């Protein structure tokens, strides 16, 4: 990145810093002036320093028009970048009316980005807090909390401390971005009482910096040096020119890559493969940004195998994108024989496509739909002539087997570099041989949940002694990914092979700049800190007395219709200006918000750190003092995959639903599949069947549903499929139906009126009748055998009569049970819910040692 473009980017990142100052001091002055005064104390007297101050001081039209600046002053670029990022012109500057009224309210907190997304709802707000991995999550709430002057003063002191250590003009672009993110992510950009305060100051300044860098690159390529003419005098006309380029990338083959494993060491391998994909995509993004001479300010979104980057629409940029895609895919073919593929699409767009205020001539383009179509087209013709020639040439580097090469026992790729698989079970009698990639992925899964190893480095060549390094595709060929210690980083930097660093969950501090990568690395551990394996997770189901079927729960879930919602969510057709909220900063804020939920907040939900007013959900008794016995295998983008003790996983799933509803203000829903399996069953088959359950839930009208393990008797008795649920026997419910009807009504009724061994069987009370497991089985089988609203009432009545107690004091309770069972049995939906409730009860009553 050239010095001038870098300066424009930093000016964009700092242009509104005065908003913090004005809210911290309550001075009656424009925020642009206060911001320039604040930053001045950290600068020298060079021309670059003076230029930065002019950008901050004159980024509004009123001041800029009378400043008498040269036509090539960057202040004109920042002015236009600010307008485009905010999505409108003629905005009042904070501080304009401080002496005339209460138009700006510095007490306002950040609104939830979902307040104006896809329909009306009661607004929710975020408290003013920093972004910290060690603290509890900042959930939105319905109360308009107050952002205090003292809180803003604290933010101001934090920036002052950092800027005194290193001047902002001397910082790397990504370093400055990180400082702003830490403190400004929950600070509202605007406190104008006539506007929605749903864009954070961080998101707005980030997008302003990104837009400024794009404008500078575009003008440089076209030889434009009259910034005043392009960005100020004739900016309205130029907003209809396709200056910008939205770049989207998407990994294909993710499912096949993740689940192509053996049962030995399955948990670590799953976690390692999922994390590898995350870092591989982050590395691709950094390779692309480096080739485009841009920073992470231009990264709109990166998670779940997808990314969006805002760049300049020039031939140079489009050629660079094609070149990066080609080189990355060459590396992926070499490493994984085409299992993974990166599809990239580009869509030119103009400033008016990014702004709320378009003129009447311009027809606004739906950016994300258009670029998604380009990505889909790229997937239809994967490779260019160079890669195809290699693939079809049996003597090429891709196809030629080295002398002595053998097939890897995990991925089945032939190589001459095999060694014992690190996931081999001791004393198992088999020695699986694995390639360096598969063994490296196993080590990566182990390192991911090691609290002492939170930094991962990409090296340009394999360092001496780094046996656990994994090859990763890059523009320069293959690079190497490995967990790192501070000493390692220093050694590799001195050797000149350290390319970049990724910091897991923001816990790394050093002189080396690292990109933060939020990871939901929750894993249940035993008393000595060892991560539970599949068998131990299944064993931890139920209670500690041996009750509760020993089964592993598997959950797969993703957001319902997120793609369509993302495309249309900010478009309100009933409004005079339907696209008033469809601004670049809002899409960036929405993307960041979703990524933060699935990569960071999900970990807090696993730890039962829930919004105020939401208590952890339990199927049976409360386990408030115990952590959830679950593992996050993968969580990112808009989907997740977890395994765990089946009852704990069910509790987590309901917690997730409730928290997601709060987080998105009820605007988005998700559907899930949850299956129960023997811990020795094939993990790839578990994932496949649970994925089918997830699809079944999504096929329910309105989606917003959960599909549970099969409800047929063969589920209990047929062990040939490892206890896997058959899709046709699954029970599908909306979340409200499951929470309120299955659990809130049926399960609770059974627990309150029956003595159930393993649940409440030790409670000898005359308001509960004894009910054995075999009798409950017979009742459940009769209910399952009914068709529609037709029921064999005679057989049902006979079986139900077996519950009738001899003791008179239990008669009233029996009559309640009999009456309620009849009511539920004759109605199809009620009967289905009762069957599911009985299933859960029976699973909880079964002994762990039962098959």
Please place each PLM-identified region on the residue numbering.
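Alpha-helical phosphate/pyrophosphate-handling elements in metalloenzyme active cores
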Residues: 1-10, 20, 32-47, 54, ...
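Divalent metal-dependent catalytic cores for phosphoryl transfer on phosphate-bearing substrates
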Residues: 1-129, 185-194, 236-240, 259-266
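Alpha-helical scaffold within the catalytic cores of cyclic-nucleotide enzymes
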Residues: 38, 209-220, 275-294, 320-332, ...
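A short glycine-enriched loop-to-beta-strand structural element that forms part of the catalytic core
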Residues: 52-59, 245, 295-310, 337-355, ...
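Catalytic/regulatory signature loops of cyclic-dinucleotide turnover enzymes
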Residues: 332-342, 371-386, 663-669, 689-714
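Cys/His-rich short segments
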Residues: 380-495
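Long, compositionally biased charged/polar accessory segments in the mid-to-C-terminal portions
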Residues: 703-851
